[in-house]
Amino acid sequence: MLPHGLIVSCQALPDEPLHSSFIMSKMALAAYEGGAVGIRANTKEDILAIKETVDLPVIGIVKRDYDYSDVFITATSKEVDELIESQCEVIALDATLQQRPKETLDELVSYIRTHAPNVEIMADIATVEEAKNAARLGFDYIGTTLHGYTSYTQGQLLYQNDFQFLKDVLQSVDAKVIAEGNVITPDMYKRVMDLGVHCSVVGGAITRPKEITKRFVQVMED
């Protein structure tokens, strides 16, 4: 089980300056030394490098685009197999109700339970309906990761209306809830923890210096 506290997302996509398994392992080490209780990471290669560097539980994902589907976070059993090989403690996958490129969500959950019975599963959702569906399927964790990042929730921010969406999710499911997406200040982190989430994933505000720099520059441009 993931501990209560701060999970730091250590990810850099191929078009980003810090794209490197070695660099992500050092990001994870910095997060560990700062007090993080877990890491969220993308790709088998990054996860293996991180697990060689820090003794923390890892939420693993594989981001891969597929034609004719907007699902890109651990979309098929191919990505699941890569994550099983990485020996991450938690496999996270898109648990929205969008059309998937291959297996159904139910099939993927069954696949993970069969092939990796000791691995926990996290649902990345965008709506309360999707949270309820993930709970029905038996996900161990339900994360607000994709709220604001789907075509039907675009423009919505997790912290709007004092985290009302997060409150709605907490009231709708019994599974452990993870706050993720636009938790960008220590005060926001404290607020979501006070609301009763199991843990919170913070990425961009800690491990993406390019995006952090942009926010400083844009303050003056605006």
From Swiss-Prot:
EC number from the UniProt entry: 5.1.3.9
GO molecular-function terms, A-Z: N-acylglucosamine-6-phosphate 2-epimerase activity
Pathway linked to the protein: Amino-sugar metabolism; N-acetylneuraminate degradation; D-fructose 6-phosphate from N-acetylneuraminate: step 3/5
Disulfide bonds: none
GO biological process, one term: N-acetylmannosamine catabolic process
NCBIfam families named in the record: PRK01130.1
Database matches in SUPFAM superfamilies: Ribulose-phoshate binding barrel
Function: Converts N-acetylmannosamine-6-phosphate (ManNAc-6-P) to N-acetylglucosamine-6-phosphate (GlcNAc-6-P).
Protein's UniProt name: Putative N-acetylmannosamine-6-phosphate 2-epimerase
A Pfam family matched in the record: NanE
Catalytic EC class: isomerase
Catalytic activity from the UniProt record: an N-acyl-D-glucosamine 6-phosphate = an N-acyl-D-mannosamine 6-phosphate
Family according to the record: Belongs to the NanE family.
Transmembrane segments: none
InterPro entries, per the entry: Aldolase_TIM (IPR013785), NanE (IPR007260), RibuloseP-bd_barrel (IPR011060)
Keywords: Carbohydrate metabolism, Isomerase
Superkingdom of this protein's organism: Bacteria
Cellular component per GO, a single term: cytosol
Isomerase in keyword set: yes
